[in-house]
Amino acid sequence: MTITISAVILAGGKARRMGGQDKGLQILGKQSLIEHIINRLQPQIHQISINANRNQTEYAKFGFPVFSDELPDFQGPLSGMLTALEKTKSDFILFTPCDTPFFPMNLLDKLKSAVKNDRTLIAYACDEEREHPVFCLMSVQLKEKLRHYLASGERRLLQFMKENGGISVKFTQEEGNFENFNTLDDLKKTVI
């Protein structure tokens, strides 16, 4: 089965635990978090977009299309995912958050191998400790189900995935890690 895939970096949140600062634009080392994400994604996939609900001019400077959620009021990652699924011309979208700069360099390959089965519409990352559903490969075939799920008031990402046959794909620490940065202190403590 040949499928087309694009990638979307989710940078549309409120970042409450970061004092409202736009996470993707915060500096880690000498680069913004979004630059770290782009640098890890580009060897894996060429067609990248950024989902951001503020500071769109800043995000556009990285040279990729930027779009905001169609649903108002920062309704969480599923809102950005729905907008992406509605806009894409690809069969699947690889989603990553903007605050997890050390994710595996084989993320796409491993998730793609899980969706080779025509019935698998979502594959998401996990490691030895827990699931990481924001790192996922999702089929556009799910956009109607996702629209209805959000309209019902639900926002739980992992629940949506499990209800729709999502498959977890295990990654080892050697492949990369899913440590994310939620506070400015987290960023200051990390040396790269």
Curated annotation (Swiss-Prot):
Residue positions binding GTP: 10-12, 23, 51, 69, 99
Pfam short name (any one): NTP_transf_3
Function: Transfers a GMP moiety from GTP to Mo-molybdopterin (Mo-MPT) cofactor (Moco or molybdenum cofactor) to form Mo-molybdopterin guanine dinucleotide (Mo-MGD) cofactor.
Domain free text: The N-terminal domain determines nucleotide recognition and specific binding, while the C-terminal domain determines the specific binding to the target protein.
UniProt-listed GO biological process terms: bis(molybdopterin guanine dinucleotide)molybdenum biosynthetic process
Family statement: Belongs to the MobA family.
Record's protein name: Molybdenum cofactor guanylyltransferase
